[in-house]
């Protein structure tokens, strides 16, 4: 073969190789795209299944609580003080549940100031902050513009603290609003949040039970008059997280057994549900999901 023919053959070979490289790159990109789409679809399907399980568990617990109230029979048996329960489901899948009776908590709208002050002291809040916070809570929720004695705060006091907002002068809509109080700090808020609610309409609570759970070291400081106060067991905060591998889905709800049903139904993974202990009630939870995905 002559030199020109050799050169032409070499050029053709290089052209064919270039085409193969381009086609291979396109195919590789397409395969990666398909795999990525498949993985994304699988992740979405897993998330939907986990969310369905979380929602089903939340509705099951609510149903059992409602039956217990109507027919005066035992409910699901889960702890009602916010303790986290861990329930094994299918292999590799776990449900974390937390049930909190709101009638055991300090109500920002209904609990009288003296009762709030007593509870806050026993929870370890310094006396000066106790007086200010209790007064600010009352001023935030009451309709008038007259500051409470010993630390109250109406609009002028908020302005003096360089805060761009003032008191609502109406009931707290959620416990998150305590962050707006002039004397509230992140450390105090973290200590108080677990014992606060806006769903204990009667305002009364069992001080001894509250302190025993939130600050056991202060049990000996309880006043002799701190007798048991039964909860009306009407409102509950219910949080469920279902996890499998690295995937997690959750549901948080407020259940009113007085006839309103779910007054809050939020798709969220509660940050405090990361570990828990087993409980006999888990058997019923697992059985209810046995036929599910």
Give the label of every model feature segment:
Residues 2, 9-293:
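Compositionally biased linear targeting/interaction segments
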């Amino acid at each position: 073969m002559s030199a020109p023919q050799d050169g032409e053959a070499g050029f053709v070979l290089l052209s064919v190789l270039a085409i193969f490289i381009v086609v291979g790159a396109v195919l590789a990109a397409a395969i990666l795209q398909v795999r990525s789409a498949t993985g994304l679809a699988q992740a979405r399907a897993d998330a939907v299944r986990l969310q369905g399980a979380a929602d089903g568990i939340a509705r099951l617990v609510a149903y059992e609580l409602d039956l217990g109230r109507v027919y005066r029979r035992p409910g699901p048996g889960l702890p009602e003080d916010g303790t986290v329960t861990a329930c094994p489901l299918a292999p590799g899948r776990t449900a974390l549940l937390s049930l909190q009776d709101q009638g055991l908590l300090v109500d920002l709208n209904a609990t009288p100031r003296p009762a709030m002050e007593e509870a806050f002291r026993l929870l370890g809040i310094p006396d000066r902050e106790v007086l200010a916070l209790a007064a600010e809570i009352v001023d935030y929720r009451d309709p008038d513009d007259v500051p409470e004695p010993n630390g109250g705060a109406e609009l002028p006091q908020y302005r003096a603290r360089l805060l761009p907002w003032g008191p609502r002068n109406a009931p707290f809509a959620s416990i998150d609003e305590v962050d707006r109080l002039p004397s509230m700090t992140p450390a105090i808020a973290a200590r108080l949040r677990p014992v606060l609610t806006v769903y204990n309409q009667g305002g009364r609570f069992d001080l001894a039970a509250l302190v025993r759970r939130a600050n056991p070291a202060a049990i000996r400081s309880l006043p002799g008059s701190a007798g048991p106060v039964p909860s009306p067991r009407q409102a509950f905060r219910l949080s469920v997280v279902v996890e499998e591998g690295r995937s997690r889905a959750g549901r948080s709800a407020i259940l009113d057994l007085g006839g309103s049903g779910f007054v809050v139904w939020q798709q969220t993974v509660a940050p405090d549900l990361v570990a828990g202990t087993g409980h006999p009630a888990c058997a019923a939870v697992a059985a209810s999901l046995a036929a599910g995905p």
